[in-house]
Regions:
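Helix-to-loop junction immediately C-terminal to a conserved catalytic motif
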Residues: 51
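Conserved ABC transporter NBD signature motif
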Residues: 59-67, 76
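Conserved ABC ATPase "signature" region
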Residues: 102-115
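Conserved ABC ATPase signature
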Residues: 119-123, 127
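Hydrophobic anchor residue at the start of the ABC signature
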Residues: 133
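Catalytic Walker B motif of ABC-type/P-loop ATPase nucleotide-binding domains
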Residues: 144-148
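H-loop/switch region of ABC-family ATPase nucleotide-binding domains
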Residues: 179-180
Length: 199
């Protein structure tokens, strides 16, 4: 299948020099692409370029063959949903957070319908991560970009989220996941992009 994204000779500058420099890679439209590497290698920065939460200082990011800067940024962010490693909850119930399709979406991410009326700030971290995924899926994205989605979870919760990510990747979604855990590349990924820190 064709590429969903292409990074072309990317450079992103930080306070102490480039965070990423001369980076090129493709993200396939099918399955799960895992971006793996140690802390400080620029993985999260690369993820944030996909929906313009950050822009490169040099180079291009192409989405379906077009520079991401050519898209309306709100439409780009609807199509490319980013879920951070710390799930964000808004005031109100789980249903308020997820939106009008809450019942179906909660079932899709493995949350019991009874949780819909619970205050979102009373969820466990694992439940909140699933809720954040449900909220993003409710935007009907083409791409789900996940930043270390299991890093704050206990072992039992990690397994459930990893299984859910794998199921989503087997649907029509493009799923991109940043991780520092090598086993995600070997056990979960269809495609792997390895990022190394600048020396």
């Amino acid at each position: 299948m064709s590429d969903r994204f292409e990074y072309r000779d990317i450079r992103v500058d930080g306070d102490d020099g480039p965070i990423v420099e001369g980076f090129s890679a493709q993200i396939a439209a099918d399955g799960l692409t895992v971006i793996v590497g140690p802390s400080g290698a620029g993985k999260t920065t690369l993820l944030r370029l996909l929906n313009r939460l950050d822009d490169p200082d040099a180079g291009q990011v192409l989405f379906e063959g077009r520079d991401v800067r050519d898209y309306d940024v709100l439409e780009l962010r609807r199509r490319v949903q980013l879920v951070g490693q710390v799930p964000v909850t808004f005031p109100g119930t789980v249903a308020d957070n997820v939106g009008p399709e809450a019942t179906d979406l909660l079932a899709q991410v493995g949350l019991h319908a009874a949780l819909a009326t619970r205050e979102a700030d009373r969820l466990s971290v694992g439940e909140a991560q699933r809720m954040a995924l449900a909220r993003s899926l409710g935007r009907h994205p083409d791409v789900l970009a996940l930043d270390e989605p299991t890093s704050a979870l206990d072992t039992a919760s990690k397994g459930g989220i990893e299984q859910l990510i794998r199921q989503l990747a087997d649907s029509s979604l493009t799923v991109v996941m940043v991780t520092h855990e090598p086993r995600h590349a070997t056990e979960l990924a269809d495609h792997v992009i390895e990022v190394t820190p600048r020396s």
